[in-house]
UniProtKB/Swiss-Prot annotation:
NCBIfam families: PRK00451.1 (NF001696)
The protein's name in its UniProt record: Probable glycine dehydrogenase (decarboxylating) subunit 1
Quaternary assembly: The glycine cleavage system is composed of four proteins: P, T, L and H. In this organism, the P 'protein' is a heterodimer of two subunits.
Taxonomic placement: Archaea, Thermoproteota, Thermoprotei, Desulfurococcales, Desulfurococcaceae
Organism, as annotated: Staphylothermus marinus (strain ATCC 43588 / DSM 3639 / JCM 9404 / F1)
Cited function: The glycine cleavage system catalyzes the degradation of glycine. The P protein binds the alpha-amino group of glycine through its pyridoxal phosphate cofactor; CO(2) is released and the remaining methylamine moiety is then transferred to the lipoamide cofactor of the H protein.
The gene coding this protein: gcvPA
Amino acid sequence: MDSHPWIPNSTREIREKMLEKIGVKNIDEFFNDIPRNIRISKEEWDNLEIGLKKPISEITARRIIEEKLSMNKVFVPLLFLGGGAYPHYVPSVIKYLISRGEFLTSYTPYQPEISQGILQALFEYQSLMAELLDMDVVNSSMYDWASALAEALLMSLRVKKNKKKILLPSNMNPIHKRVVNTYLSPHNVRIEYVNYNHDTGLIDLEDLKNKIDNDTAAVYVQSPNFFGYIEENAKEIGEIVHDIDSLFIMGIDPISLGLIKPPGELGADIAVGEGQPLGLGLNYGGPYLGIFATRMDMKLVRQMPGRIIGLTRSVDGSRAFTMILQTREQHIRRAKATSNICTNEALSAIAAAIYLALLGKSGIRKLAELIYYRSHYAQARLREIGLNTDIFKSDFFKEFPINFDNIGVKYRYVHEKLLENNIHGGLYIGNWFPELGETALYAFTEIHTKNDIDLLVEKLADIINELKR
């Protein structure tokens, strides 16, 4: 008997041959790695009471489904998680515009003559981002911050061919660190970590000077860093890096650039970051938007990963958008390509372009100021109830670490108590940075009102007072 026309390998004979090739006796053995207590056997499946048993109307089906869903405990908590993904407000117009058929497509615009709309939108994203970063060339997106950083380091190794060492901050985002290690593991490269100053939470300049040498291809610095603090020595770090002819890579939060100096002004050769705050929402962790930019040096531009959209003229003199410098990408031999990121995050980039266009220059600045002041208000209020909000003596943008060692319990207990009050507390970072003890990273954005912050303080004070009894 032939396989089902729409379901491949659906006959018993084909399945048995596949299992024999794999080296297992039957389907149950194939799924042995899955714990038995969460598996359903064939007999259990055959006897399972599922389905509605008879055709029903759409409205009846809707009522049944809503009744089932109402059994879930669903709440929208106050969310104060930091660490790389943030609860920012997403204007409703963004979802409406990116849902248009011209944008909401998996089509990769390799035929520019019939893709002018989407190519222009991506060109606008690049232009807006270049202005925000004060950088010359921006690609039209990477997967996320972590992949953008890893690609920037690979790009540095291609540009500085005879240098085989990378310097990273020891207090970088631990998730980014894992991604970077995965990307660089097949390459002949040494990764060393520069210590952070335990008073300021910033890069230890003396340790950087001791570890940087003529074999260093690139140095990466994040500002605001993983702890939320603004790297006030970024320009000096860039000068140290350039003195030995290495590349200076900066990681940024795009909204923070409404207040602090952009990477281009600080001397960065490459800038990377996360576009999630620019109208994307949390999205259960993705899709996000990797920001990637470089200064105008063709040695750098030709080694950039991802695609670049350019503006040119057609044969009849009309304005035309097209993908440029494509010989860097997957159109050439895979081993020679600068990266193999293909469809990437074009829709996310268009959403970010809409967001930036909506806010404009003054809007970005006002938003950054609002976030800065609210986060500092939160720090002052939390200090009032006896929490250590001054682990490091530096200025921060929208998140900062809070130490809970002095209340006598693990942070997990505090977090669970907050959840009982529909408050999702900060991200515990003591497992990544054990020297900080029971410490969590709390973030505050424009969605957190003064009343929200006061409520958080009130509930934390209640927890502390209860523990003192």
